[in-house]
């Protein structure tokens, strides 16, 4: 289990109800879901002690792969359903790995002597990674193993309760109060529905989706806008010479520093501020953002509520990104957007795209306003706050949606590329079907294909040699026993896993494209075979060929 795999595994990133791929909350692992998280004072380790802690985690096998081997698939996948009993049963042996799994994965206290066999306990207590509770120790922060794209063993550090049971949280011992120094009890319990603006989440479906779709070509500068616990910055240091991570929440910046330090992956520059304020006139080759995109009636939780009405935060990010991109640079973000009765959502989003930028917008899911409100009310723990309070907040959400004319909310991702073109390519897709991550290279290839189509007129297209992309299959649809199919579907096995309906001429054309003959010569041969006028076929087919190239079914052969 590598390449962006966290422990425990998230539900499939494109799952609906809840759509884990596009959420700021990770409800994958668990303990009792009673509506409490903790916001301890953060660890303040030095480099040497952090290195020793990292070596202890590696020595014990506290990695994504190690946990899967320890727990076994049934217990491991049960964590995704918020069930911890199988994992607790699998960690009764007292080994160093079992102790670490209980401490950091299940967030259960372990005896001091057992922890001593796995960790430099006194250093961890002094630095705030662990808290002493009599003869036991417990974790001060959430430490989640995460598999890097090239087999690296990384760890994401966040507030307790955010990866175990979601923002709704886990039990907090009664003696945990604010104000304790590192190494002592010092947490704040959070009851269901209570505001906690400083909460910092760990790795979840949204963050891993963004990491998967990000273009990973080597760049000079990358910006992680709204870094949270630092997962995007962690990825970026592997292919960017200089990484800047920003967040409005100072605790998030501190957690991101801990994530990079504990993972030993590289360094980044951290700046506090909202949106593009910390970087002002600076430009970047890559901007990534998993912003607080939730469309809510009021900003209660910094990690999810951006403080702007409706989808204004996402629109602002898109519109302002161009001035911070270098030529050819990418901006990639997750977003929610409103479906209103007054405008088509595709037209609304296309209008956000700044001039001089190509765009690829993909809507992965849609929820009506009642589903959407219920999703985020549960996320905040409001369903545990009492019937009257829950009803009042539910009503406030629906009142805000009615006031704004919002009928539904879309979930998806937006990629911009600063091309400088006077005729930019703006593609708006609705694709709720499974895809194959990582998609970063598929995103890069999408824009390369748009460049090709933009500079190639129909006459030149017919002189181009094309080949069928790898992993394209043909399906014939029609009643049993029919001599000819009603229609033909081309389907991709990889990447976006698109499907395109074509006629028999289009299917035959695609099947002959092997990189040896020009498109025009293939059409002439098909016309002769079918007894059609080749001039008519040459005039009719470029539109279909452009569709097949644009969606990646056919690839131009260079040279």
Regions found by a protein language model. Give the residues of each.
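Conserved Class I SAM-dependent methyltransferase catalytic core
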Residues: 249, 310-363
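Conserved SAM/SAH cofactor-binding pocket of Class I
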Residues: 196, 204-289, 295
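Long, charge-rich, low-complexity alpha-helical segments
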Residues: 96-142, 209-212, 242, 416, ...
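Compositionally biased, low-complexity flexible segments
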Residues: 1-32, 179-184
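Flexible, glycine-/basic-rich loop-and-beta segments that form/coincide
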Residues: 369-447
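Mobile active-site "lid"/loop adjacent to the S-adenosyl-L-methionine
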Residues: 250-251, 291-316
């Amino acid at each position: 289990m590598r390449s962006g795999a966290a422990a425990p595994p998230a539900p499939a990133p494109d799952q609906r109800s809840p759509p884990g791929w596009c959420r700021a909350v990770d409800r994958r692992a668990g303990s009792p879901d009673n509506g409490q998280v903790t916001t301890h004072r953060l660890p303040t380790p030095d480099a040497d002690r952090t290195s020793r802690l990292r070596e202890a985690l590696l020595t014990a096998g506290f990695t994504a792969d190690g946990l899967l081997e320890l727990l076994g698939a049934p217990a491991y996948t049960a964590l995704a359903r918020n069930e911890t009993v199988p994992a607790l049963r699998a960690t009764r042996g007292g080994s160093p790995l079992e102790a670490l799994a209980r401490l950091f994965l299940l967030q259960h206290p372990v005896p001091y002597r057992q922890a001593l066999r796995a960790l430099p306990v006194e250093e961890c207590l002094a630095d705030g990674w662990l808290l002493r509770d009599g003869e036991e120790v417990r974790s001060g922060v959430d430490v989640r193993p995460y598999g890097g794209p090239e087999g690296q063993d990384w760890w994401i550090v966040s507030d307790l309760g955010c990866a175990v049971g979601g923002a709704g949280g886990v039990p907090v011992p009664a003696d945990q109060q604010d104000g304790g120094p590192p190494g002592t009890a010092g947490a704040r319990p959070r009851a269901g529905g209570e505001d906690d603006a400083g909460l910092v989440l760990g790795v979840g479906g949204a963050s891993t989706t963004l990491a998967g779709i990000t273009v990973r070509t080597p760049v000079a500068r990358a910006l992680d806008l709204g870094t949270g616990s630092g997962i995007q910055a962690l990825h970026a240091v592997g292919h960017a010479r200089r990484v800047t991570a920003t967040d409005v929440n100072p605790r998030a910046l501190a957690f991101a520093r801990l994530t990079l330090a504990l993972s030993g992956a590289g360094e980044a520059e951290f700046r506090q501020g909202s949106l593009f304020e910390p970087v002002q006139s600076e430009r970047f080759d890559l901007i990534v953002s998993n912003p607080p995109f939730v469309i809510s009636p009021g900003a209660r939780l910094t990690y999810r509520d951006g403080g702007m009405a409706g989808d204004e935060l996402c629109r602002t990010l898109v519109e302002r990104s161009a001035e911070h991109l270098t030529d050819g640079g990418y901006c990639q973000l997750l977003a929610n957007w409103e479906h209103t009765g007054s405008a088509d959502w595709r037209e609304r989003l296309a209008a956000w795209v700044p001039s001089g930028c190509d765009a690829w917008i993909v809507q992965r899911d849609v929820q009506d306003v009642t589903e959407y409100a219920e999703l985020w009310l549960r996320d905040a723990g409001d369903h545990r706050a009492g019937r009257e309070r829950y009803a009042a907040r539910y009503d406030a959400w629906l009142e805000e949606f009615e006031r704004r004319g919002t009928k539904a909310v879309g979930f998806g991702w937006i990629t911009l590329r600063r091309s400088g073109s006077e005729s930019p390519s703006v593609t708006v897709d609705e694709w709720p079907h499974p895809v194959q991550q990582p998609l970063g290279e598929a995103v890069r290839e999408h824009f390369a294909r748009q460049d090709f189509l933009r500079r190639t007129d129909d006459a030149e297209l017919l002189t181009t040699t094309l080949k069928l992309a790898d992993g394209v299959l043909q399906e014939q649809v029609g009643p049993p026993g029919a001599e000819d199919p009603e229609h033909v579907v081309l389907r991709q096995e990889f990447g976006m896993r698109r499907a395109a309906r074509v006629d028999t001429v289009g299917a035959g054309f695609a099947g002959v494209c092997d990189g040896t003959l020009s498109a025009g010569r293939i059409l002439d041969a098909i016309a002769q075979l079918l007894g059609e006028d080749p001039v008519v076929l040459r005039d009719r087919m470029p539109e279909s060929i452009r569709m097949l190239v644009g969606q990646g079914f056919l690839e131009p052969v260079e040279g």
